[in-house]
C-alpha cells in the first residue's frame, strides 16, 4: 500500500466525488452561522443542517467538502486529551459527501468502497463494516453487491438504553431527521490489542473507524416513533487525520506527514530534539486551532469563544515554557502552517501576517506573568502535595492568567488533583466582592493631580489632544510600550466616560506609528476621563500629541439606545403612572436595560402601548435639543430629575420628543435616527422594582427577524400557516392532554391486570404472604395503586414492587395493617434500596425508595423472602 500525503488525500477525495457529479462546497467558518446552539463547527454537516431540516434550498443535490472543525468548548471538548493520546485533536478536518434527496445507500456505500480500495488502495481484507440491526438493505449491499464476507459485516443493536439508541443510529436531535448509519473500520491486524466493533474489547486500537455513512430516511416523533422521510438524504464523514494515519501506515495521527512537519517546526522553535515529546504534539495541534480561529474572527478574550481561544493558546505557550521557551515562539509557526495548509484554505494564507501578529500579542501578554505563576504553582506543590488548593488555582487564574484546565493539565503531569470546587467558590466570592465594591474601584485608586479633561464628544468624534498622564498596573508612568495595558489621560477628548448608565466609548488613540486601542473610558475624577486599553504598536509618552478617534458605529448604536431610553421612560409614566421613577439603567451598543419603580408586572397590553408610543415619536422624526442651564431653571422647566442623584449648579437638559430630562449622555440628532424600538424582556429585579430590556435600530430588526424565523419554524413543524398557528397549537395541546388521560387509564388497567398475575407468586412465611416483583413500565403512582390492590387481596402480607427506567430503580414496600408490628415497610424498602444504590422511607405500612443500580435489582428482590423470614 503506497504512502500518500495529506494534501493528496484531500485532493483525491474531492476529485473522486466531483467525478460522481458532486459540487465542491468550501469549508464553512469555525463559528457556525446557522446554529446558535453550537460554540464551534464540529462536523461537516453543520453547514448543511438547514438543508436537512428543509429550511434551506441549495442549487445542487450532491455536495462534497473538506470541513475545518474544532472540538474544544461546550460538550464537544477534547482539549485535555490533546497531546496525551494518538488521535485527539482540537482542530481537525472532516471529509464528507452529501446527497439531498438524490442518491441513497447503494451509491453511498459502493462509492465509499471504490474510493477506499481502488483510489486509496486499502487492502479489502483489512476492511469491515457495521450496520444498524434492522438495516437489511445496507447489510445486503455490503454482502451481496460489494462482496464483503458476512462475518465482516456486523449488525449493531440498540446498545445505548432504548429503541433507536445505538452507535449505528444517528439522530440530529430528540426529534426530527434520523436514520441508520454504516461505519467502515480498518483492521490494523492481530498484533494490535482490541476487538471488533460490538465486542467487549472494541475500544482497543486494532479496529479503527475511518468512515461513517449516515442514511437520513426517517423522521422521529416526540413519542419515539419513526416515519419515512419523503426525500432520504446521505451524510458521510471521514476524519482526514485518521484516514491519513491508516494510508501512511502509522498508528498515531501525530506521525502523519502534516504533523511530522508541524512537529519539526515546533522542535526548531523550542529546541526540543525528541520529536515524540508530548509538548511538541500539543504545540503542533494548537497552532492549527489558534490560527484557524483567528482566521475566522475569534480573538483571544475573557469569555465565550474568545476564552476558548485563549485557553488553547496558553496551553501551547505553557508547553513551550516547559521546553525552555521564555519568549514568544508560537506565532513563528504560522508561516509553516500556511505553507502546509494555505493552498486548501486560502483565507489562512491571506491573513498570515494578521494571524501571526495576534498570536504574538497574546504570547507577550501571557509571558509577562507565566514565570511568576509557575513559581506559585511549584511552591504550592512542594512537599508532595496531592491536591492543589482551590484558592491557589483561582489566584493563578485571576492574577496570572492561568485557565483552570491549564493548571489541571500541569497538575495531572505530577499526579496531583485540583480542588475545582474550591476554585469555583473563590471565583464566586470575587464576583460578589466586585459587585459590592462597584466598577470604579481601580479608577478611584489612580492618583491624578493634573487638570481636567475637556470633553468634546458632543460635537466631534475625533480630534487632537495631548497626553497629560499615563498609568500602568495602577501606577503613574512616563511612557507606555508595545503590548502594555494602561490608562491614558488627555487634556481634551471626544471619548464619553461611563456615567448615567451609558457605557464608555471605545476607539483608537494614535501618534505616528503608536496605536492605543481604547477598550473602555471611565472617570478617574468627575472631570477627568481615563482611557483604558492596550498599546498595540509603538511607544507613547506623557506630553505626546495624539489623535483620538471614537468608534463611530458603537457610539451611534449606543446613542440610539440612550435616546430611546428617554422616550421609554416618558411612555412608562404615561402608561403606568407618574409613580414610575428610574432606579437604574445600562445603555450600550446592543441594548438598553431600564430599572424602574413599579409594584406589578407590566402586562402585554401595557408593553404594546409603550412600544406604540415610543415608535410614534420615532416616526415623528423630531429634532432633539440639549441645553445647559442652572439647576433652578431646569427644575422650573419641568425637567425630570432623579431624587437620589446629586447635581451641580449647572446641568444639561435634554429635550427629545415629549421627554425632558437632565442628562449628560450622548444622543441622536433626531428621533427618527433611532429607527425602530422593541421591548425584548420585562421582569422583576427586587421588591417594587421592574426591569425592561429593549433594542433599537438594526438590533431591533435582527430581533424581529429571529422571532419571525422561530414562528415560521413552529408553523413548519406543525404544518400550518402562521395565521393558524395558535389554533393548531391549542389542538395539539388538547390532543396531548387527551393522550395523557388515556395513558393514565391504561396504566391503571395494566396495574390491575398485573396485580392479579402477581398474586400467584406470593409465598407464605409463618402466616405472612411475601411478594417481591418488578412491574414493567410502571411509575410511582402505578406502583402505589398496585400495592393497594395486592394488600387488599392478600390480607396479611409484606410486599415489594419495583420499576426500572434505564439504570434507575423505583421501589415501593407495603405491609398490611395487621402485620406492621412484625415488619416495618420503611425497614423493608431500605433493605432492598441499599442493594441497588439508594435509600428511602415512609410510613410503617407504605414506603418508597429509589436506586441507581438496576443491575442489582433481581438479586435484591430475591433476598426479600429471606430477610422477612429472619425478622419473624
UniProtKB/Swiss-Prot annotation:
The keyword Chaperone does not apply. Catalyzes the attachment of alanine to tRNA(Ala) in a two-step reaction: alanine is first activated by ATP to form Ala-AMP and then transferred to the acceptor end of tRNA(Ala). Also edits incorrectly charged Ser-tRNA(Ala) and Gly-tRNA(Ala) via its editing domain. HAMAP family: Ala_tRNA_synth_B (MF_00036_B). The gene is alaS. PANTHER family: ALANINE--TRNA LIGASE, CYTOPLASMIC, ALANYL-TRNA SYNTHETASE. InterPro entries: aa-tRNA-synth_II/BPL/LPL, Ala-tRNA-lgiase_IIc, Ala-tRNA-ligase_IIc_anticod-bd, Ala-tRNA-synth_IIc_core, Ala-tRNA-synth_IIc_N, Ala-tRNA_ligase, Ala_tRNA_ligase_euk/bac, DHHA1_dom. Consists of three domains; the N-terminal catalytic domain, the editing domain and the C-terminal C-Ala domain. The editing domain removes incorrectly charged amino acids, while the C-Ala domain, along with tRNA(Ala), serves as a bridge to cooperatively bring together the editing and aminoacylation centers thus stimulating deacylation of misacylated tRNAs. Binds 1 zinc ion per subunit. SUPFAM superfamilies: Class II aaRS and biotin synthetases, Putative anticodon-binding domain of alanyl-tRNA synthetase (AlaRS), ThrRS/AlaRS common domain, Translation proteins. CDD domains: AlaRS_core. GO terms for molecular function: alanine-tRNA ligase activity; aminoacyl-tRNA deacylase activity; ATP binding; tRNA binding; zinc ion binding. Its main location: cytoplasm. It comes from Verminephrobacter eiseniae (strain EF01-2). Pfam families: DHHA1, tRNA-synt_2c, tRNA_SAD. Belongs to the class-II aminoacyl-tRNA synthetase family. It is an enzyme of class 6 (ligase). It catalyses: tRNA(Ala) + L-alanine + ATP = L-alanyl-tRNA(Ala) + AMP + diphosphate. Zn(2+) binds at residues 562, 566, 663, 667. GO terms for biological process: alanyl-tRNA aminoacylation; negative regulation of DNA-templated transcription. It is found in: Cytoplasm. Keywords: Aminoacyl-tRNA synthetase, ATP-binding, Cytoplasm, Ligase, Metal-binding, Nucleotide-binding, Protein biosynthesis, RNA-binding, tRNA-binding, Zinc. One of its GO terms (cellular component) is cytosol. This is Alanine--tRNA ligase. The keyword Nucleotide-binding applies.
